Curated annotation (Swiss-Prot):
Function statement: Catalyzes the reversible reaction in which hydroxymethyl group from 5,10-methylenetetrahydrofolate is transferred onto alpha-ketoisovalerate to form ketopantoate.
EC number: 2.1.2.11
Gene name of the encoded protein: panB
Species lineage: Archaea, Methanobacteriati, Methanobacteriota, Thermococci, Thermococcales
Family listed: Belongs to the PanB family.
Source organism of this protein record: Thermococcus kodakarensis (strain ATCC BAA-918 / JCM 12380 / KOD1) (Pyrococcus kodakaraensis (strain KOD1))
Protein name: 3-methyl-2-oxobutanoate hydroxymethyltransferase
Annotated binding of Mg(2+), by residue: D44, D83, E114
Cofactor binding notes: Binds 1 Mg(2+) ion per subunit.
UniProt subcellular location: Cytoplasm
Enzyme type, top EC level: transferase
Length: 284
């Protein structure tokens, strides 16, 4: 069992901020775990940042299982959280249970489900089975068509009510935490005060119990990022420069240099072995 558990995350509420980041493969998960992240999240955002999809709707269970397995192999300390992709739980509770079990078998410690009130039965069922669940309300990317695109949530009474209803339903169903995405900070603060489970914000201000960002966004892999993202590095420029330097040295014959390859120390020995090898080939 990994050091960080759902129980540990719950105990951090109001005491210690929760640091969560996405990771989609072995090396990124290894680095995230070494950095001391509390939660390493295999998000369906991989559809956009890894596979180049315009949204998350085309991400499959097979992709989520594949990437979860890679991440789980790398993480020793942090809690590994895996997203339930669009279409994997909406049809029925039974379908949701089956797919959640696939992610747990792949190495996840918990699953995340977008939505709250509408999926309370599934959350309750999973928790009873021993599968920890994190909810997600506010902007829910899997439902961006209904929301009219990616936009700030919580500006109307109805939206505030819906966000609160989702969070409270998740709490009652047994979820151990809830993501609040692209929600006005005042609303996120209200939700955080109204529920006993941790709130993890992404574009939801500072008055939450933790924060989550996408790996590629915070590391500056892509030029365009959501407005709520802080770039902690500009890896795109570093990687681009390294690749250009490599190409240049190959074209100019400067790579590999002497320290990057090996030769026979005894050239006469090489000549003897070369001649014997050539003779054997001629005899075939």
């Amino acid at each position: 069992m990994r050091e960080i558990t759902p129980r540990k995350i719950i105990e951090m509420k109001g005491k210690e901020k929760i640091a969560m980041v996405t990771a989609y493969d072995y090396p990124s998960a290894l680095l995230a775990d070494k950095a001391g992240m509390d939660i390493v999240f295999v998000g369906d955002s991989l559809g956009m940042v890894v596979y180049g999809e315009p949204n998350t709707l085309n991400v499959s269970m097979e992709q989520m299982v594949f990437h979860t397995r890679a991440v789980a192999k790398a993480v020793k300390r942090a809690l590994v959280l895996a997203d339930m992709p669009f279409g994997s739980y909406e049809v029925s509770v039974e379908e949701g249970v089956k797919n959640a079990m696939r992610l747990i078998r792949a190495g996840a410690d918990a699953v995340k489900i977008e939505g709250g009130y509408d999926h309370k039965k599934l959350v309750k069922k999973l928790v009873r089975m021993g599968i920890p669940v994190m909810g997600h309300t506010g902007l829910t990317p899997q439902r961006y068509l209904r929301l009219g695109g990616y936009r700030l949530m919580g500006e109307t009474e109805e939206e505030i009510e819906e966000i609160l209803r989702d969070a409270k339903a998740l709490e009652k169903a047994g979820a151990f935490a809830v993501v609040l995405e692209f929600v006005l900070a005042d609303v996120a603060k209200l939700v955080t005060e109204e529920v006993s489970i941790p709130t993890i914000g992404i574009g939801a201000g500072p008055h939450v119990d933790g924060q989550v960002l996408v790996w590629h966004d915070l590391l500056g892999i892509y030029e365009n990022v959501p407005p709520f993202v802080k770039k902690y590095a500009d890896l795109a420029s570093i990687i681009q420069l390294a690749l250009e330097n490599y190409r240049g040295e190959v074209k100019e014959g400067r790579f590999p240099a002497k320290e990057h390859y090996w030769e026979f120390l005894d050239k006469d020995d090489f000549e003897r072995k070369k001649m014997k090898a050539l003779e054997r080939l001629e005899d075939e």
